[in-house]
């Protein structure tokens, strides 16, 4: 679990802050706290001196990027900006602050609420929004949050030079002026429309590889990490012809807590002992896989049937594949690189590609 926040700086005045880039590899993420619980006088000082993001930093960050779009003529007044989030902000304070930043910049905040990152970016393309913000700290624990940005029309992420410009703009803004600025932009709630678009997109046979015959004899455990897939995963999978068990789909239990991909980073194999009485003994998904695998162990050893797990991160844009090993009574963990290889091999076979 990592934080993208920069190292502390000793001075809290914006003029003396010379850090080049406050983002990490995919937006910015790290510990959060309310401004009143911080010892700093403004959100940038809290970020650079204490290594925490306050709700007012979220307002500053979205406002700054919207200003970038307006000044570069990538957006005009009242253009659409889509914003969604994972369920970690139980109070809603950080989400609401980010929405205010969009509106104070004079753009229309199109709120899609709790949805996985792919659904937010899909809706951005659908409505032709100038950009999309996703408020998430991915696989990091619930006391952290962050902001991802998707560029309009292309859905691309920011390049490092874009991050540097955005950092510079954040440092140049007088937050006291922003705090008192009026809400110039409009507010639109498109949660249901965005949800329907994503569900319809995923149900389209052109957008997935599922069929009734290729799931026969397969048991699937789906772990959504108490995250962004939680409100929609049951409906998304309701027509899948397989034995499916959904786990960790209750955000109240804590996003990424003993669930999802967070604690499986760098793990290739999990033994039964680690699940029965070891470090993974409290992990429902692994216990379910072990139980279902053992129930079918003899058959699994002598057939092509499988017990699989699909394990997501908090914002639903990353997945690991788990596979019960009936011979060693353990679980194989396959990360993104291996999944990409399998997908490429499938496409090569399906389309008879020679290279």
Which ranges hold each PLM region?
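An N-terminal, well-structured beta->alpha segment
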Residues: 2-98, 104-105, 185-220, 228
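Gly/Ser/Thr-enriched, mixed-charge loops and adjacent short helices
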Residues: 9-15, 31, 143-303
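Conserved active-site and cofactor/substrate-binding residues in soluble primary-metabolism enzymes
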Residues: 23, 52-60, 93, 97, ...
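Short, glycine-/Ser/Thr-/acidic-enriched flexible segments
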Residues: 28-30, 35, 88, 116, ...
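N-terminal small/polar loop signature for handling phosphorylated ligands or for N-terminal nucleophile
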Residues: 71-144, 235-321
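Short catalytic-loop micro-motif centered on adjacent basic/acidic residues
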Residues: 84, 109-111, 220-223, 355
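Proline/glycine-rich low-complexity loops and linkers
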Residues: 112-114, 168-198, 325-355
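Short beta-strand-to-turn element immediately C-terminal to the catalytic PLP-Schiff-base lysine
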Residues: 149-152, 320-324
